[in-house]
């Protein structure tokens, strides 16, 4: 559960906050009920009291326009609604009654010199990433030709060896073994590596390899967007393979369908070349070029012409 203090600490470099009142409530939780980041923070809004309320110049002018009794009424509405924190932007000084109310009811009241609009944008980006749906999957996550590729498959099939071959061909490692995936936007899944495993690749027989030290800075990536899953299976597996699948295979990841390619592992197959070819083909499909569809159209035209 994200707290107000964590929010302050995590954004200290971009947003310098100063505590005014309610410091004892620094561990107050910011609600996460599957709400979008845009609903978690915004300008002063009494209709949505449960979000972080930001006072800019216009909001403070609106608030101070009322008499003390009306202000107390508005504050009561925010408090009953469970406001997590009140932030004053533009370096504004709050009226004493606002300070007293926040101190009395233990509501965090903070000030920052950052402009209100910029403050809201920064916090929405932060909250969108911090509270994004996440999962951890087993596999190797790579940057192949600028595309985020997750290599999966049962243990012992050579996922790490394949990753090492791709890295030696100029591609980049994001994460090995434990890949943390986050849905940071409606159509975006980002993958990154846990801090403990950064830059490391475990290869059977060689142990742990520090890819960054061995291959240089350009051989690792901090994060990538997941666009393709390459699933390795044994050549003896009973899975039924279609040589020319009429429809793209997808796999659900955090509620999003991700393109999936299945490759059989067998002696003599150059999997690194196959993965690169799969990535290039995926890039073409993302650009609207369907090689199989074009072939089927040509085939249909040829059959039509031969029947005349």
From Swiss-Prot:
Record-linked Pfam families: Hpr_kinase_C, Hpr_kinase_N
Any GO molecular function: phosphorelay sensor kinase activity
Catalytic function, reaction form: [HPr protein]-L-serine + ATP = [HPr protein]-O-phospho-L-serine + ADP + H(+); [HPr protein]-O-phospho-L-serine + phosphate + H(+) = [HPr protein]-L-serine + diphosphate
Ranges where the record places region Important for the catalytic mechanism of both phosphorylation and dephosphorylation: 201-210
Assigned EC number: 2.7.11.-, 2.7.4.-
Known function: Catalyzes the ATP- as well as the pyrophosphate-dependent phosphorylation of a specific serine residue in HPr, a phosphocarrier protein of the phosphoenolpyruvate-dependent sugar phosphotransferase system (PTS). HprK/P also catalyzes the pyrophosphate-producing, inorganic phosphate-dependent dephosphorylation (phosphorolysis) of seryl-phosphorylated HPr (P-Ser-HPr).
Domain notes from UniProt: The Walker A ATP-binding motif also binds Pi and PPi.
Misc note: Both phosphorylation and phosphorolysis are carried out by the same active site and suggest a common mechanism for both reactions.
Protein name, per record: HPr kinase/phosphorylase
UniProt source species: Bordetella parapertussis (strain 12822 / ATCC BAA-587 / NCTC 13253)
